[in-house]
């Protein structure tokens, strides 16, 4: 059980706190949906950050590069409890700190993500709080992370201070997209100063080639032009011509989808290009630009 002490006499008198369901954070219940294949030393570095839990760790990268899978994999392999709940534009103070709930037994306080994570760490001895796309939170909400991300390692909720017990660890991992993403909030300077971390580059052709299953995929007709298309679209994004770049996840979708339909329909290549690549671009001018690139790269007609 975690230590809780009164923080401020002027704070509202606390009410009974609902118990945390620790089973859902138990390392044995962590879901790892596929194998993570490292590209460089990113698994080693993140493993060190999670195991040491000394400083919050930030990963900045394009979408679809396996950040969530890697975090799940590391926690599962090292038997570290994982707290992974959605945060983003709609995240409110009550989501992070907690809120009152009324049921047939009375009024209770339901812990939010931050004090709950401390409770989980104290229960298991070591936990990881994973915040995917954390910078999408409003700046006022990001400020609520300050005390748990610095030397205080604590948070006040329901009139009590939740703090790590001696010998217990809480790793805090955030992932964010580059600020070039449309609609992405920036991470505040005050919060970013509390993190160390790494920026993952957009994967090269050799990176993508090494982590994707190319079984039954023609090298000349599909693999080589698909890798070329991915790099071309990324270059278009850097120039501001499109807002979307193909990720490793997109290419995995393509290979899976193509294998599924190749013997079932006519023109499976054109269908896969339409249903996996073209569908990612919603703006008409962008879609037309990508269509022309696809036709030129694959020598097909869409």
Annotate the PLM regions.
Residues 1-302:
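C-terminal regulatory/interaction module of P-loop NTP-utilizing enzymes
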């Amino acid at each position: 059980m975690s230590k809780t002490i009164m923080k401020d006499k002027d704070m509202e008198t606390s009410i009974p706190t609902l118990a945390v369901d620790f089973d859902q954070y138990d390392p044995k219940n962590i879901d790892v949906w596929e194998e993570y294949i490292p590209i460089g030393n990113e698994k080693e570095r993140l493993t060190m950050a999670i195991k040491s839990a000394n400083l919050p760790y930030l990963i900045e990268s394009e979408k679809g590069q396996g950040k969530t899978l890697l975090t799940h994999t590391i926690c599962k392999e090292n038997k570290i409890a994982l707290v992974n709940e959605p945060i983003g534009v709609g995240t409110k103070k009550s989501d992070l700190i907690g809120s009152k709930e009324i049921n047939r037994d009375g009024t209770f306080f339901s812990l939010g993500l931050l004090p709950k994570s401390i409770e989980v760490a104290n229960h298991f001895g070591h936990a990881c709080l994973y915040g995917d796309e954390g910078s999408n939170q409003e700046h006022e909400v990001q400020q609520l992370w300050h005390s748990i991300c610095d030397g205080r390692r604590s948070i006040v909720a329901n009139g009590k201070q939740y703090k790590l017990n001696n010998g217990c660890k809480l790793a805090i991992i955030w992932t964010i997209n580059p600020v070039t993403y449309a609609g992405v909030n920036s991470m505040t300077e005050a919060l970013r100063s509390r993190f160390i971390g790494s920026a993952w580059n957009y994967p090269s052709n050799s990176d993508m080639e090494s982590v994707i299953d190319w079984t039954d995929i023609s090298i000349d007709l599909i693999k080589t032009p698909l890798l070329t298309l991915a790099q071309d679209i990324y270059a278009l994004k850097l120039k501001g011509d499109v807002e979307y770049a193909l990720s490793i996840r997109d290419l995995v979708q393509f290979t899976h989808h193509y294998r599924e339909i190749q013997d079932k329909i006519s023109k499976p290549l054109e269908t896969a290009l339409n249903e996996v690549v073209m569908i990612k671009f919603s703006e008409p001018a962008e879609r037309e630009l990508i269509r022309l690139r696809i036709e030129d790269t694959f020598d097909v007609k869409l």
